[in-house]
Amino acid sequence: MVRVALVGARLNRMSATPISAAAEASDLELFEGEARLWTRAFEPTEATQLFDELRRDVKWQQEEVLIFGQRRRVPRLVAWHGDPGASYVYSGTDHLPEAWTPALARIRDRVQVLSGARFNAVLLNLYRDGRDGMGWHADDEPELGPNPVIASVSLGATRRFCLRHRRRKDLKLDLPLPHGSLLCMSGETQHHWLHAVPKTRLPVGERVNLTFRLVTLR
């Protein structure tokens, strides 16, 4: 059972596509948003195998961003994969997609079945320990369209995933995303909510996060 700290949201449980008997979905009824959580979209053994393959086969890179005229390293390793032409601009950098690996294609296909959405690209983030994190942001780039579906798979160590409403400071969520989980955000969520993976001083292992999306092909 996942402990969910909710403010301004309600959690409903419903059956998911019968890929696994344990693949139960929880609807997060967000104010001005939609989200659904599968805490066990992938069985532990399968999730560990996928984690190992991605850790080994993906060409991880540590990127730099320009902040107030200074170049600083992003506190995580990243990679971008997808269909030909699925390039994507984020953090001021234009990313050209690497081809789908067998593990990525396998995860993508499972996510598409569970979510009912189609995806042509994925952003991967490798959080090496608690010193790696992701600041507050929304996935609202023009390439994603007006109301994008963002499907986030977590493999490895459990990390906190935080959301807060852009205007209503009293509306917040704090979700621990476990190994093999899937969180799908849709509707107007990216217009009204920001999300982050905060750093932590607690000892924590490596985590691979994959955010699948449908981008406009160039």
Regions found by a protein language model. Give the residues of each.
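Non-heme Fe(II) oxygenase metal-center motifs and adjacent flexible, charged/small-residue loops
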Residues: 2-218
